[in-house]
Amino acid sequence: MTFINRWLFSTNHKDIGTLYLIFGTWAGMAGTALSLLIRAELGQPGTLLGDDQIYNVIVTAHAFVMIFFMVMPIMIGGFGNWLVPLMIGAPDMAFPRMNNMSFWLLPPSFLLLLASSTVEAGAGTGWTVYPPLAGNLAHAGASVDLAIFHYLAGVSSILGAINFITTIINMKPPALSQYQTPLFVWSVLITAILLLLSLPVLAAGITMLLTDRNLNTTFFDPAGGGDPILYQHLFWFFGHPEVYILILPGFGMISHVVAYYAGKKEPFGYMGMVWAMLSIGFLGFIVWAHHMFTVRMDVDTRAYFTSATMIIAIPTGIKVFSWLATLHGGTIKWDPPMLWALGFIFLFTIGGLTGIVLANSSLDIALHDTYYVVAHFHYVLSMGAVFAILAGFTHWFPLFTGFTLHPSWTKAHFGVMFTGVNLTFFPQHFLGLAGMPRRYSDYPDAYTLWNTLSSIGSLISMTAVIMLMFIVWEAFSAKRKVLQPELTATNIEWIHGCPPPYHTFEEPAFVQVQE
């Protein structure tokens, strides 16, 4: 098989998963570089880069790159493609060529996003792209239009979602019920359903924005009978499910890692875990306006969105305590994936607690658009999603490559990263409570201390990213082969060896169901 046939025209779920992982890693480094520019600007009062426009272009690009080109490609595209067919005993994905197209839509989409930063003044709108700031007066030129066209990544996600839903429902062995599939498979299924239902609404919203900018429509312009609040509703009806799309596959991975390294044959409360994820997926669609408490909604509307948002804490709590129950009484192996998983449980819970604070509409009036919100979502993303990715990466790296990571360096990497992200984001809670607003490139001197500490933390995190690159290089360089994975009876993805052959389950697996 030629290089081009294997990697450009690939129809193999393992190869496409590998492409997603490489692309996501590359994008993650780009996103990290952007975040360091942000923290460099904020390390001391005064300007470093120039005006607020260039700063906001960097902030916007940082968000888009991390969400659409790092977390989603790695979790759903990388781990999802690699593991879902192996875990359900399918020969491949349901639509292998569409799978390839889903991947190859991402690099052009990424180029469109980068192009938006290089023309005119760039798209300094924030990732929410609210009009009128994103309209053709405040942002004349092609920047925002190019940023809108990077919705191509959304097309990729919709195609991927269709593929995963079809694969998971239709390509299991007949004897296997949906309630016998591993939790990671469930998490990807629910994530795919969320993508399929939410992305078209975003498409509608940004298409209206595109026509407002270029074809003189007035969907979001009061002068023509439109309403900018309509855009916020459309955007957040996608935007809130999106944050659950980012974390749900992480929940699935953490369930596998915790059970494996606690020496358990299954996670505690399988059905509770499944229904908790289903509940989170459902509730994620009916809380979107908690992002909009500052736009003057009726008191009864605010009361509803406050209480509905708090209800999400219940299924989330079920998951957290089920992970703790899985750990309980186990023989814990303190391997790097376990460290990441424990870090995830602890820090994700802290992020969840600040989320409960922000759910209160009255408190949110004071905290909205301050660094408290930034601290909240970076605790659940930078220490939830990213820690889950690193837990999954360190756990399944031997499966993907056949090589093992250096154990002590990987643990050291965890220590550096843990220190870095906490030093970066914990002080931001204090900044937010003291009223420092988001999306400004400068600040009063009173905020200097915590900003300086936060920026030092970002440099430590950068060191961790460089360490990770070195650790991966070292693994391929040293070529320590995997001898024998443990617990293969309950972890079907390992049964073909490390790495598995190019084609697995070429004939349907025989499943014996215990009566």
From Swiss-Prot:
GO terms for molecular function: cytochrome-c oxidase activity; heme binding; metal ion binding. GO terms for cellular component: mitochondrial inner membrane; mitochondrion; respiratory chain complex IV. Heme a3 binds at residue 376. The chain crosses the membrane at residues 13-41, 52-87, 96-118, 142-170, 183-212, 228-261, 270-286, 299-327, 336-357, 371-400, 407-433, 447-478. One of its GO terms (biological process) is aerobic respiration. Its main location: mitochondrion. This is Cytochrome c oxidase subunit 1. It comes from Gallus gallus.
